[in-house]
Amino acid sequence: MKTPPKPALPHEFPGAVWYGDEEIEAAQRVLRRQSPFRYYGPECGLEVARFETEFGRFLASPPGMPWPDDSGLYVTAVNSGSGALEVALDALGVGCGDEVLVQGFMWISSIAAIVRNRAIPVLVDSDDTLNMDAKAIRARVTARTKVIMPVPMLGGVARMGAIMTEVRSINAERLSRGLPPIKVLEDCAQALGAHARGVPGSLAPAADEGVHRVGAFGDAAIFSLQINKNISAGEGGMIVTRDAELHRRIEALHNAGYAKDADAPRNWYGDAPLGWGHGRRMSELQGAVARVQLRRLDGILANMRHSHERFEDHVRRLGMTPRQHADTTHPGDTGYYCIFQLPPGPKDEKGKIIRGRAVAAALNAFALHPWFLHDFEVHVYYNIEPLVAKLPVGNGCPWRCPRNAFHSAYSYARGALPKLDEALVTHVGINVPSRLTREQEDDIISALDYVFKTVIQE
């Protein structure tokens, strides 16, 4: 078979490749004001505060519908997605003696934020969406469970309706036994704009049954604005909640640790000490650029979803199986990454790994930015060396803390999550750039054809 030419493709950074005159003007607007800091300066507080409001309105909007005037959501902008996770967990009261349930296919920050808050991560196996399996949650819950953290990985949504139904059932039982309810923190760093079907609320329904944006289901959610994300300010993060008191804590802890309870607080950072602040404030430069990017988001998602659908359809025609959608009648994935299961091949694990690496190498020759998921660096629990080795944050915490002695029951080596482990050695994925032309999509399809016929079928 003749080798197709290597395609010339746009960069895979979904939001950043759309930077243009509007983002430049937004940044210059802040510089002309000489007010890059949110809370004081000659003309401060104009960008990040507005971005928070607009972000909440977007999240509250049904897909394809206008943004409502009142979102019913509280939003705090921070300087990174990792910082958003750390602040949110701190605000939820996570610390020594607590467990946080999290899936094994995520980004290292999901684990790091738990460990840095001195709690113990507890891994939950995945279903065919490669996200948290609702049916696997109950067996991992203990009296120490404080938070459950689903991660819509690479823009592919989990079965959030089933997860929230399970959490409400567990919480009803806990309350009957005098135990505090478990909170749900959605780590939506890679999934801004995705949506899922179900009923939000971890204790009682917080909205009607239906299709909701991810981030609207749990007690809190975080998002990232890093360069690989659907919109980007270079770095940045968002924390969202419906709970006014939780928002008060988030606002305090993302800053200097003081809540702004008075109409005119004594200091710019607040007047009521709640804890130790993280200093995770978003700059006005980030906020200004992010506001422009948010207005572009629907178009970015539409492009990725269109390309992703073409690639998935072709993968099916080749006899391979795309990653399962949580809702086949109303897919809510962002389209950022196209993952597919290789057809039956080697029976032994070594053979599966050799084949997966060969397929990824062949796809890489066409600059498709592929990953054999088993090798997907620190997106996979057993590739996170500090986790497997239980490296401490400082002075032995959290592993040597007497209140965390129960961690000895948990291993993070490969084998802890059998369903996910098997999926990772049989799946390969490619990036879906957000500015592909029809001809570039055709070039990628030709490359998939070639690799299938010369490597996968061999």
Model-derived features: positions:
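Intrinsically disordered, low-complexity Ser/Thr- and acidic-rich flexible linkers and loops
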Residues: 62-71, 165-182, 198-212, 349-350
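Conserved PLP cofactor-binding pocket of PLP-dependent enzymes
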Residues: 190, 258-268, 310-319, 358-427, ...
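PLP-dependent aminotransferase-like
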Residues: 90-198
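Generic structural signal for small/hydrophobic residues in well-ordered secondary structure
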Residues: 26-27, 55, 84, 100, ...
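Conserved PLP-binding active-site segment in aminotransferase class I/II-type PLP enzymes
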Residues: 1-83, 87, 163, 424-425, ...
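Active-site region of PLP-dependent enzymes
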Residues: 190-201, 205-212, 217-337
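Short amphipathic alpha-helices in soluble, non-transmembrane regions
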Residues: 250, 351-366, 444-448
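Conserved PLP-binding active-site segment of the aspartate aminotransferase-like
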Residues: 326-349, 370-394, 425-439
